[in-house]
Each structure stands twice: as structure tokens, then as C-alpha cells.
């Protein structure tokens, strides 16, 4: 059988925004909160849909396919999936992507295209979440898919000079047993490219205490620890991430400012805060962009980093996030340079590589 090859897609990095400054595009930077599946653009989703136009062969009855998943999506239909107005719409878009990621070549394709897009934005390093918990939940065999990921990463690094680490992501509301599978797999495949674990999903449905043993196991194995916390609920979730799970970085942390003592601690300990402006706006976690705590956290001395979260699904780019910081929050070029420096400092790169990247600023 002839190997399927998708038509070449160019990076889609403009979303009807004002022209961004050359300074921002050229500014060396890293991205530390980015979901692989959320980087799939409508053209690629349409191509995957054409390739896989039969219902997914579910290995269990826990996960139901979307309506019309038996036919290919046009590019326009794929783009329309990303034009949602609430969190449910986002989940449907995410599901539409994961349904069509079925074989190693699919993962190789999206990993390679992600590296290409990052390079176009002056991003020199990224630490990328892979939804391993979802893959297991669907009954897929992970190892062959990981081999595809690695091929895409290695080709991308060679062609574009952008380094990538993988963070294996579990899902809170799937429970601790499913999370343990994710951690065990990260430990088994731990190498230079598998750097850590994360956990996302609904903070309201599963307390941090449920995952304490899982995170302790990961820490003993030398994996780095990230936690989505304070995105949809308040400060207690962040305290749990820090004190129960031992989080080294916090995803979103929107509600850290609700508790003055907590914010002071985050500043004092320089815990990296992975902020995602457009994501928080589009999911409704932040009512309007001007209310986002980016400026407050930065001025308080917190170690904040700008990120895209799910760039294609939120119709943003890392360049656009930096431009928003300047246009909406008044960040100067020098302050943007500080944000870029934060992204390198908060990364899990070796110290020598960090120094080399920081010297570029």
C-alpha cells in the first residue's frame, strides 16, 4: 500500500490582527504551555479527515464519536469547528481533532508542522503537552504513535532549529488510575525528549489529593511536574497543586491573585506561571481581556510566561500573545524582552542551553 502523504500546508499564523511589530516576531522566545492537539490547523484537520473518513474503531464504549465523523470535513467545516462561543464548543473541536489522529504518520505530521509554525514566530524551544490520557481512554496503543511523534520532532528540529520536549498529560476527571498509566508510560519512555507530566481537565471534579501518589511517583523518577491550576476555580486549587502535587510550574493560575498571601508566595518562590491570554478569554474564564491579571502579576514580580495553550483552536499565535501584551496591557519592548527571558528561565532545558538562549536577548 502506498504511504499516505498530506499536501503541504504552510503555517497559518495570521488571524486578521493588526500588523505585529518586527521586534516581536524576531524576539527569541520559548513556549511552555502548548497542547499538541490544539496546534492542528483547519487544513491539516481536513486532510486527516479525508484520510480517515470511517468511524473510529473504538476499543471501549466509554467514548462516543462525533456526528458526521464518517465523512471528510472540508476546510471550511474544519474552520467552523474552531469558531465556537463556549467551552462546550471548544471540547467538540478538540474531540474532532483527536478522533482523526489514528496512526503514527498522523502524529509525525502534526509534530513536524508544529515545529514549522513555531520557527516562523521566533520560538526557539517549546515544551508541548501530549494528551496521552485521552489516547489511553480511547483504547489506542501509544508506543507506535510516540514513534511517529519522535520522527516529527527530530525532522522538525533538524529542518527548523527548534527544540521540543514532550509533557505527557493526564486528565483529572478520568481518575487517578488512568493518570497512573500516563505517568508509568512517561517513566518507561523517559528520555531527552520526555521531560515531564501534566494534568488538566475539570478542576472541580477531582481534588489534587487524588493524584498525590501519582505525582510523587513521577518526581521520584526525575520527571518535571506541571499542573493546570486556578483556571476555572480559586486559590485552593493552586495551593493543592503546590503543596499536594509539588508542581514546579502552574498552568493558567488566573485566580492566584484572589489570595494576597498566595500571590506573595508565588513571587517569593518565583514559581513560573504559564499565562494564556486568548485562551482564557475564549473559554470564558476571563470575562474580558483587560481584566486578565497579566499586568498585575508582572508588576508584582511574578515569573510570568506568555503562551498560546491551543493556538489553532483559539485562533492565536505566540507572536499575537506578545502583541496583545503590548497593545492591551502597555508592555514596552523591554518588558516583552523580560517575558521572553522568563520563558527561557522557566523552561526545563539544561542550564548551559538556557544561558545560550538568554544571551540571544
What does each model-found stretch correspond to?
Residues 3-4, 65:
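Cationic, low-complexity basic patches in intrinsically disordered or flexible, solvent-exposed regions
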Residues 5-9, 14:
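Acidic, Ala/Val/Gly-enriched low-complexity intrinsically disordered segments
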Residues 15-223, 232-237, 244, 248-249, ...:
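Metal-cofactor-binding active-site regions of metalloenzymes
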Amino acid at each position: 500500500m502506498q504511504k499516505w502523504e498530506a499536501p503541504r500546508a504552510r503555517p497559518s499564523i495570521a488571524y486578521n490582527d493588526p500588523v505585529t511589530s518586527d521586534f516581536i516576531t524576531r524576539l527569541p522566545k520559548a513556549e511552555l504551555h502548548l497542547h499538541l492537539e490544539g496546534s492542528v490547523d483547519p487544513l491539516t484537520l481536513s486532510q486527516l479527515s479525508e484520510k480517515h473518513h470511517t468511524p473510529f474503531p473504538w476499543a471501549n464504549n466509554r467514548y462516543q464519536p462525533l456526528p458526521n465523523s464518517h465523512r471528510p470535513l472540508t476546510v471550511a467545516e474544519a474552520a467552523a469547528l474552531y469558531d465556537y462561543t463556549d467551552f462546550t464548543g471548544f471540547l467538540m473541536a478538540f474531540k474532532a481533532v483527536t478522533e482523526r489522529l489514528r496512526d503514527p504518520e498522523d502524529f509525525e505530521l502534526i509534530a513536524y508542522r508544529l515545529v514549522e509554525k513555531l520557527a516562523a514566530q521566533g520560538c526557539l524551544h517549546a515544551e508541548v503537552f501530549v494528551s496521552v490520557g485521552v489516547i489511553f481512554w480511547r483504547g489506542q496503543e501509544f508506543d507506535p504513535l510516540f514513534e511517529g511523534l519522535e520522527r516529527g520532532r527530530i525532522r522538525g528540529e533538524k529542518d527548523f532549529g527548534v527544540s521540543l520536549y514532550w509533557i505527557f498529560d493526564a486528565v483529572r476527571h478520568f481518575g487517578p488510575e488512568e493518570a497512573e498509566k500516563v505517568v508509568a508510560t512517561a517513566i518507561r519512555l523517559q528520555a531527552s525528549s520526555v521531560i515531564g507530566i501534566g494534568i488538566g481537565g475539570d478542576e472541580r471534579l477531582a481534588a489534587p489529593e487524588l493524584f498525590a501518589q501519582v505525582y510523587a511517583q513521577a518526581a521520584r523518577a526525575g520527571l518535571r511536574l506541571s499542573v493546570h491550576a486556578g483556571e476555572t476555580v480559586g486559590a485552593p486549587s493552586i495551593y493543592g497543586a503546590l503543596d499536594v502535587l509539588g508542581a514546579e510550574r502552574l498552568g493558567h493560575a488566573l485566580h492566584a491573585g484572589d489570595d494576597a498571601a498566595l500571590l506573595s508566595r508565588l513571587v517569593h518562590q518565583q514559581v513560573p506561571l504559564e499565562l494564556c491570554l486568548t485562551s482564557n478569554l475564549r473559554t470564558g474564564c476571563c470575562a474580558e481581556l483587560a481584566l486578565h491579571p497579566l499586568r498585575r502579576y508582572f508588576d508584582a514580580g511574578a515569573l510570568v510566561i506568555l503562551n498560546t495553550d491551543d493556538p489553532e483552536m483559539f485562533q492565536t499565535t505566540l507572536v499575537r500573545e506578545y502583541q496583545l501584551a503590548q497593545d492591551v496591557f502597555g508592555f514596552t519592548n523591554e518588558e516583552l524582552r523580560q517575558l521572553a527571558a522568563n520563558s527561557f528561565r522557566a523552561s526545563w532545558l539544561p542550564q548551559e542551553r538556557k544561558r545560550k538562549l538568554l544571551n540571544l536577548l
